[in-house]
């Protein structure tokens, strides 16, 4: 627009070349009230440049000029020709007062003239004033109050000191008027109009807060440009009604404070990173020391347990011998009708009181293969998933660096620590905890598996009749999922927005699903869900979750509610009846009729498994409440909305499992109690930090930046970074506790361990 406007003006000037212009020796800071001449005659204002590198600002106003008879002004400088038109019309918003800051007089010598040429097609009255900009330079940690309007953009200059690697340009305002802030390399012309301010450098929209991190390697000196937008469409989800034709509007003024602060040097990044690495190293030392002493305890324990098991086996053989002899003497086996299907699944699971032995009748090797499929399938999914994610995010990072449009990503810009291609390197590196603890879960699970194999080699009876069946596949899959969560979360934080939000959220769903399956498998080893069915269901679930991000009509919510409640009902039936129910309506009707006829005092209404019924009722009430809330509120952040019940159900299941152990008077190992206590503390801290949001991709970028907050730890980590760290600890403590919570049952007969 600027180039075409200048060409248009030059054509006008060429048409009046033969006319004698009116030349006015002008003075700075003087208001000239003039009228343009007839026949496109020129009025030339000549200003003496008193000082090199000084900066001029022109203010013009005219109430008589129109779209078809504009007041035109051309500023002739040595490096460029700039133009100005009154009224200024942008998207049919018309402003009769216009101001522009010109390029610094870098090539002028003292006494040379700077000219402003004014003309119009018909005579109009106008006011004109030229002034030298005072305090054109910005300085470190010095706050500057600036005022700009839609037709009066402002820009200031800043030079990064030699001992500074990067700076943060911070703005705050009490006004919510939408404005665009741009950081541009030193040059002429400066792009300071609403239609071209986004064409150069780094830029972002602003309501009450904005922060732009600038690296010295990218721009050692730059202009900070402030352009107030004609409306709030770029900052608000509610679009304004634009005029159909040019309409005069009053000036949209916005006052704000500008502060430039030095960011951390690259060398200073090592302190918070090394600090975090030392914490992880300390955890590693504690884990290995624990395993060392645990190995000593294991050898002593196995020695005592071996004698105990031999004594029990001898006593059992004696009891079996006398029982068989007594039966032989009293009756003949031929007198009894033998139940040939006593080992049938339907018969066993219909018992009033199930034991783990009833649900672990499948050969160990066959079960182990099913559990191993989880880690194999997840590893394959992870490879293809993360390759695609990495490819997309690398492309996105390059696009962000080229376009400079910081509205593409919802960072916490007040605590963004740039490095290499990362705008907020701290958000990326803080995800290392997931990768570390996921790896640690796998290593500890492998050591545990080896320990059990050594134990079972010494005493094979343990693997067949005692304790809970030990399968490592699911826990290894959980470790892989946590590693993938760290990688996906790191890639998401390269440029967080609504397009790639599902990168790490999808892995949170995987962790939640595997956690529930792990707890279920502890006492239901034969009822393992096929990995293909589990991941297939999760895939459909994720498709619905992604659809919910973009579709918000009532039809979608109605379908979602029906499917969600139906899924909860099916899971509830499976949990309550342990897989021996059917959807055959005739059998269901006959069963209800038989129960009603055979019951006394409505005893058929009383659930046979009260504890199961209670937890199912609690879960269904909680999940129904979530669905009702969704129908009422239609939350835009649908992925997080679904994640809450998904993880909440896991927590309720863990609490239920612990309470049932206490009800059946099963001891909880001290280490499991310690781990659970640490998990509760970690989850509490994580929950508090998560709710203290520092950005929100579901909101407009300018609105999201209103949530931005400074770093709160080591001048490097913000609330969300600490959420990453604390939730990584919480996940590790939680799943490690689940893995050892039943170690007290290692030498308890399997046919005496209750299923719940």
From Swiss-Prot:
Topology, Cytoplasmic side: 290-373, 443-473, 518-530, 576-612, 659-671, 750-756
GO BP terms in the entry: cholesterol import; RNA transport
Location(s) in or outside the cell: Cell membrane
Matches recorded under InterPro entries: SID1_TM_fam
A Gene Ontology cellular-component term: Golgi apparatus
Keyword Transcription set for record: no
MF annotations from Gene Ontology: cholesterol binding; double-stranded RNA binding; RNA transmembrane transporter activity
Topology in the lipid bilayer: Multi-pass membrane protein
Domain of life, source organism: Eukaryota
Tissue specificity annotation: Highly expressed along the intestine with expression also detected in the pharynx, especially at the terminal bulb, and in the excretory gland cells.
Reaction it catalyzes: cholesterol(in) = cholesterol(out)
Major subcellular site: membrane
Residues bearing attached sugar chains per UniProt: 39, 63, 140, 174, 257
Keywords, ordered alphabetically: Cell membrane, Glycoprotein, Lipid-binding, Membrane, Signal, Steroid-binding, Transmembrane, Transmembrane helix
Extracellular topological segments: 19-268, 395-421, 495-498, 552-554, 634-637, 693-728
Consequence of gene loss (knockout): Hypersensitivity to cholesterol availability and decreased cholesterol uptake. When grown in low cholesterol conditions, 72% reduction in offspring number compared to 25% reduction in wild-type worms, 60% reduction in oocyte number, altered oocyte distribution in 47% of mutants, and 5-fold increase in embryonic lethality. In addition, in low cholesterol conditions, growth of mutants ceases by day 3, resulting in a 63% reduction in adult size at day 5, there is a 22% reduction in the number of L1 larvae that reach adulthood and a 4-5 hour delay in the L4-to-adult transition.
Function field: Cholesterol-binding protein which is involved in dietary cholesterol uptake from the environment. Does not play a role in double-stranded RNA transport in contrast to other SID1 family members.
Protein name: Cholesterol uptake protein 1
Organism: Caenorhabditis elegans
């Amino acid at each position: 627009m600027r180039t075409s406007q200048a060409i248009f003006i030059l054509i006008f000037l060429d048409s009046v070349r033969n006319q004698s212009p009116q030349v006015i020796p002008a003075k700075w800071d003087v208001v000239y009230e003039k009228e343009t001449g007839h026949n496109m005659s020129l009025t030339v204002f000549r200003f003496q440049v008193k000082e090199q590198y000084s900066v001029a600002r022109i203010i013009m106003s005219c109430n008589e000029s129109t779209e078809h008879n504009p007041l035109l002004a051309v500023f002739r400088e040595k490096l460029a020709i700039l133009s100005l038109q009154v009224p200024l019309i942008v998207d049919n918003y018309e402003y009769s007062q216009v101001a522009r800051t010109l390029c610094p007089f870098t090539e002028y010598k003292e006494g040379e003239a700077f000219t402003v040429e004014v003309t119009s097609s018909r005579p109009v009255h106008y006011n004109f004033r030229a002034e030298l900009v005072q305090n054109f330079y910005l300085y470190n940690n010095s706050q500057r109050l600036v005022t700009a309007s839609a037709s009066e953009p402002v820009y200031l200059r800043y030079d990064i000191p030699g001992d500074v690697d990067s700076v943060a340009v911070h703005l705050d305002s009490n006004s919510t008027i939408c404005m665009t802030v741009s950081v541009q390399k030193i040059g002429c012309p400066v792009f300071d109009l609403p239609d071209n301010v986004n064409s150069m450098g780094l830029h972002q929209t602003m309501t009450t807060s904005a922060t732009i991190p600038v690296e010295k390697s990218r721009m050692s000196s730059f202009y900070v440009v402030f352009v107030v937008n004609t409306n709030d469409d770029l900052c608000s989800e509610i679009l304004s009604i634009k005029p159909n034709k040019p309409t005069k509007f009053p000036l949209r003024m916005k006052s704000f404070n500008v502060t430039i602060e030095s960011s951390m040097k690259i060398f200073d990044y090592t302190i918070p990173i090394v600090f975090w690495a030392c914490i992880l190293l300390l955890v590693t030392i504690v884990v290995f020391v624990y395993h060392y002493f645990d190995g000593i305890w294991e050898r002593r324990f196995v020695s005592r347990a071996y004698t105990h098991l031999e004594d029990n086996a001898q006593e059992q053989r004696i009891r079996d011998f006398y029982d068989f002899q007594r039966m032989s003497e009293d009756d003949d086996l031929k007198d009894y009708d033998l139940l040939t299907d006593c080992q049938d699944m339907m018969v066993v699971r219909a018992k009033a009181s199930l034991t783990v032995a009833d649900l672990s009748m499948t050969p160990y090797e066959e079960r182990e293969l099913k559990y191993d499929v989880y880690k194999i399938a997840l590893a394959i999914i992870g490879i293809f998933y993360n390759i695609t994610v990495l490819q997309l995010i690398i492309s996105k990072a390059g696009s962000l660096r080229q376009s400079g449009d910081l509205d593409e990503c919802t960072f916490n810009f007040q605590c963004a620590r740039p490095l290499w291609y990362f705008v907020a390197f701290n958000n990326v590196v803080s995800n290392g905890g997931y990768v570390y603890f996921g790896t640690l879960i796998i290593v500890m699970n492998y050591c545990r598996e080896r320990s059990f194999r050594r134990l079972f080699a010494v005493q094979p009876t343990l693997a067949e009749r005692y304790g809970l069946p030990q399968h490592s596949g699911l826990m290894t899959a959980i470790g892989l999922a946590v590693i993938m969560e760290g990688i996906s979360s790191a890639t998401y934080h390269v440029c967080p927005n609504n397009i790639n939000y599902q990168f790490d959220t999808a892995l949170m769903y995987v962790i939640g699903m595997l956690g529930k399956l792990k707890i279920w498998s502890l006492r239901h080893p034969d009822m393992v869900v096929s990995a293909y069915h589990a991941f297939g269901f999760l895939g459909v679930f994720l498709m619905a979750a992604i659809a919910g991000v973009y579709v918000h009509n009532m039809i979608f919510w109605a379908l979602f509610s029906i499917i969600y409640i139906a899924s909860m009902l099916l899971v509830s039936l499976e949990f309550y009846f342990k897989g021996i129910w059917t959807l055959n309506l005739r059998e269901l009707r006959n069963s209800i009729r038989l129960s009603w006829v055979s019951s006394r005092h409505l005893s058929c209404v009383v659930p046979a498994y009260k504890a199961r019924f209670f937890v199912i009722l609690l879960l269904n009430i909680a999940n129904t409440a979530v669905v009702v809330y969704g129908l009422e509120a239609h939350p835009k952040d649908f992925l997080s909305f679904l994640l809450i019940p998904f993880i909440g159900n896991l927590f309720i299941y863990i609490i239920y499992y612990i309470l049932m152990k206490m009800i059946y008077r099963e001891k909880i190992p001290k280490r499991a109690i310690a781990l659970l206590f640490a998990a509760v503390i970690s989850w509490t801290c994580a929950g508090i930090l998560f709710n203290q949001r520092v950005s929100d991709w579901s909101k407009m970028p300018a609105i999201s930046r209103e949530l931005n907050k400074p770093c709160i730890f080591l001048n490097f980590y913000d609330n969300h970074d600490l959420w990453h760290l604390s939730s990584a600890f919480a996940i590790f403590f939680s799943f490690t506790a689940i893995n050892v919570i039943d170690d007290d049952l290692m030498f308890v007969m399997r046919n005496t361990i209750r299923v719940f």
